[in-house]
């Protein structure tokens, strides 16, 4: 019999119904919060390219259907009903003993949504620092992450267009098709394995994370810090407490 159940992202493979079975068996649950899905059906707190907290402000998830936040009416309804089920049954509030957020920003949002403050704590992400690394400098601006709209990679491409003398390199898998015209100083590296990613960071000048969404606690910030590379990010979400103002 386990002493504790550690839960991370339940969706899309595990139903919140599993939490009731753990509670029935008398095993306490600690849930690590990686996004905002307990409050916002999409998990992003984002609508029309901007941060959105309407579901938090109204105390329910139906705005996801109203604004079609998943850009598919059927998908938006499905995501909303999933959250409605969890809220009506108390799947999280009744069964989870403690919530471990990765930033204080997340913690404050859960508390604002009605979760008891004494059950919500902060355990930031960590990383194993490399024993040694090569810091022979590079001259390019580095982007690390999915090439998708919420990550704001297109914003950085526009910055590259305005600064043709500076090289920009993007490491990450494409998640969407784009007809953007790519300037000559932009290079796509594709998905990089860990050793390749370490070299990519080491040889950059700095890392930029232009996310439109709040994000959780991006590991890329820690990876860059391990190699003495600063990260530039937006002044919203947990970025200000991770990077500093």
Regions found by a protein language model. Give the residues of each.
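Membrane-proximal helix-turn-helix segments that form the acceptor-binding/catalytic region
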Residues: 24, 37, 52-98
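Conserved donor-binding/catalytic core segment of Leloir-type glycosyltransferases
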Residues: 100, 134-151, 157-161, 169
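Carbohydrate-associated surface elements
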Residues: 105, 126
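Glycosyltransferase donor-sugar binding loop
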Residues: 144, 166-180
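Nucleotide-activated donor-binding/catalytic signature segment of Leloir-type glycosyltransferases, i.e.
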Residues: 178-198
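Short alpha-helical segment that forms part of, or immediately flanks, the ligand-binding pocket
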Residues: 198, 221-226, 240-241
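Acidic donor-binding loop of glycosyltransferase active sites
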Residues: 202-216, 229
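Short hydrophobic beta-strand element within catalytic cores of glycosyltransferases
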Residues: 221, 230-233
């Amino acid at each position: 019999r386990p002493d504790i159940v550690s839960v991370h992202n339940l969706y899309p493979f595990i139903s919140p119904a599993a939490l009731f079975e753990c509670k029935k068996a008398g095993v306490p649950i600690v849930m690590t919060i990686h996004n905002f899905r307990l409050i916002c059906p999409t998990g992003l707190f984002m609508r029309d390219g901007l941060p959105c907290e309407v579901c938090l402000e109204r105390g329910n998830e139906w705005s996801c259907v109203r604004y079609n936040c998943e850009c598919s009416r059927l998908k938006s309804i499905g995501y909303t009903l999933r959250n409605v089920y969890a809220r009506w049954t108390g799947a999280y509030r009744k069964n989870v003993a403690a919530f471990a957020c990765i930033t204080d920003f997340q913690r404050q949002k859960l508390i604002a949504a009605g979760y008891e403050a004494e059950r919500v704590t902060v355990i930031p992400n960590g990383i194993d620092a490399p024993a040694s690394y090569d810091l022979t400098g590079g001259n390019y601006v580095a982007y690390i992450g999915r090439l998708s709209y919420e990550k704001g990679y297109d914003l950085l491409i526009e910055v590259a267009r305005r600064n043709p003398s500076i090289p920009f390199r993007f490491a990450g898998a494409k998640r969407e098709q784009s007809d953007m015209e790519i300037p000559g100083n932009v290079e796509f590296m594709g998905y990089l394995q860990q050793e390749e990613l370490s070299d990519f960071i080491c040889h950059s000048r700095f890392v930029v994370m232009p996310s439109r969404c709040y994000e959780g606690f991006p590991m890329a910030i820690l990876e860059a810090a391990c190699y003495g590379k600063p990260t530039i990010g937006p002044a919203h979400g947990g970025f200000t407490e991770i990077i500093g103002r």
